[in-house]
Amino acid sequence: MAEVESFQLDHTKVLAPYVRLIGSETGPKGDVITNFDVRFVQPNANAIGMAALHTVEHSMASLIRDRIDGMIDFSPFGCQTGFHMIMWGEHSSEEIAKVIKSSLEELSSDEFGWDNVPGVAEKECGNYRNHSLFGAKEWSKKILAEGISTDPYERKVI
């Protein structure tokens, strides 16, 4: 079987929350994509509940695109501790961490309500009943309070 980078990561050594550059790849026509590990929760210590994670996913899909061009995808890890963020072009962990921090600040604000969360209707979402804005806001506040590091092994909070 092929080796998968994320399964080679020693999950006992990382210090979440952080943004980690997994790598960049160049396609056959020269296009570059960059993949990031956006880890919100310490692996094997906690997990974001599905309803909150789902609402974070939907909210961040829009909030990130408001702040930076070229986001291809922001997909949750099955372990519910964070997200893969895939971007067109080359980007640094510092640049992405600033975007993530700003997005979480807006999500956690009192002004951010259900009308700001995209894709929560039955025709827009395959599991539209499984959302929690309250949970998404609480997790966002917790992540921001802990600080987002640009290094997975040493706390370098932005």
From Swiss-Prot:
Any one Gene Ontology MF annotation carried by this entry is: S-ribosylhomocysteine lyase activity
UniProt cofactor note: Binds 1 Fe cation per subunit.
Keyword Iron: yes or no? yes
BP GO annotations: quorum sensing
- EC number per UniProt: 4.4.1.21
What does the UniProt keyword field contain?
Autoinducer synthesis, Iron, Lyase, Metal-binding, Quorum sensing
Q: Which InterPro entries match?
A: LuxS_sf, Metalloenz_LuxS/M16, S-ribosylhomocysteinase
Give yes or no: UniProt keyword tRNA processing.
no
A Pfam family found in this protein is LuxS
> Which N-terminal stretch is annotated as signal sequence?
none
What domain of life does the UniProt record list for this protein's source? Bacteria
Q: Which residues bind Fe cation?
A: H54, H58, C125
Instruction: Read off the SUPFAM superfamilies from this record.
Output: LuxS/MPP-like metallohydrolase
What is catalyzed by this enzyme? S-(5-deoxy-D-ribos-5-yl)-L-homocysteine = (S)-4,5-dihydroxypentane-2,3-dione + L-homocysteine
Cofactor(s) essential for the protein: Fe cation
- What is the role of this chain? Involved in the synthesis of autoinducer 2 (AI-2) which is secreted by bacteria and is used to communicate both the cell density and the metabolic potential of the environment. The regulation of gene expression in response to changes in cell density is called quorum sensing. Catalyzes the transformation of S-ribosylhomocysteine (RHC) to homocysteine (HC) and 4,5-dihydroxy-2,3-pentadione (DPD).
Self-association and partners: Homodimer.
Q: Which family does it belong to?
A: Belongs to the LuxS family.
Record's NCBIfam families?
PRK02260.3-2 (NF002609)
Q: What is this protein called?
A: S-ribosylhomocysteine lyase
Q: Which organism is it from?
A: Lactococcus lactis subsp. cremoris (strain SK11)
